[in-house]
């Protein structure tokens, strides 16, 4: 029996200099699993609650000492003695302990830290890599990365409305080559921006964050960088957007300050997207509508859902019950998976399974506030998700996930699969 003997949480810092939790779970064999919890900037209102202390005299109110205490004084007592390989049972025990819909008593950050640390300890005990422990013997697909190379919106202090402009090296033969292509385009983009006199400082997720003349100019400079790096847009490299539209939505109107006609209805916003899709090799749009604008989501899905990937992030918040409703109404065709939106590994896996059964694609994602924890890289391979979104090609908090995927690809050797364009199995290409 892989019995839990001790659980310990501490307060650490994330990539934005804000506190977060790190949890260690110890087993009777002496092995230990450690996990750190990420944090988002643009968050869905139905996400599980990230518990913060609110003491303005300490870390500007963002401390997590209460969540740490909840792990050390409440959760630890309840799960000590349980078998670490009983992931479902341990996660269920923590949900019962919390007893609230959005994990507001103990905090999703407290619960998730324990959930992931338990899985890591169990994998160590069994003697297999984390991706294999979670996914079994068929975990073998390396994900196509969505690389965020221009940051805007809530992720950057600039005038760009759209939060993320991403490249997807779908023409690569394997993950290692995809990463190389992305890095080369990233450096080419820096050169392009410098040549135009733009600032090349980076945002929260490592992408460049210049002030640009329009949102479309971001696409133009990326296209130029792809060609400068020696690749063919639309064949070897595709584009993806995360609009984070909930941040732009108020009183039934979307406001894009950097557009000539800044105020847009849902219909006008769909027209705006369709125009971009017709002009550029955009294969994916995330959060194209606000999380509560389900009518807008339906219009977007009906118009573009057969041509491109329509990803729900704030819309679904990795919540199986919300996803189920979206599937029933024909909303979106893909889900973004963020571990801390729902708060346990078990519920995350439930959401992924539900999405796949409905023919939705899954994109495993980081948060804008990250740590050196690489769990999501293992998760992407464990569930054969096919896609991962973990930032740009700089900042260790982003690059560590890519480096972990390189290790996994090496370990899998000739068993490893990389599907490139084929990951978009539910749209016409």
UniProtKB/Swiss-Prot annotation:
State which pathway it belongs to: Carbohydrate degradation; glycolysis; pyruvate from D-glyceraldehyde 3-phosphate: step 4/5
According to the UniProt record, what class of enzyme is this?
lyase
Q: Which CDD domains match?
A: enolase
InterPro entries registered for this protein in UniProt = Enolase, Enolase-like_C_sf, Enolase-like_N, Enolase_C, Enolase_CS, Enolase_N
Sites binding (2R)-2-phosphoglycerate sit at 163, 338, 367-368, 389
Cofactor(s) for this protein? Mg(2+)
Q: Which organism is it from?
A: Citrifermentans bemidjiense (strain ATCC BAA-1014 / DSM 16622 / JCM 12645 / Bem)
- Pfam families reported for this sequence: Enolase_C, Enolase_N
Which NCBIfam families does this one have? eno
Fetch the PANTHER family from UniProt. ENOLASE
Catalytic residues, chain numbering = 205 (proton donor), 338 (proton acceptor)
Protein name (record): Enolase
Q: Which UniProt keywords apply?
A: Cytoplasm, Glycolysis, Lyase, Magnesium, Metal-binding, Secreted
Q: Which GO terms describe its molecular function?
A: magnesium ion binding; phosphopyruvate hydratase activity
Query: How are cofactors bound according to the entry's free-text note?
Result: Binds a second Mg(2+) ion via substrate during catalysis.
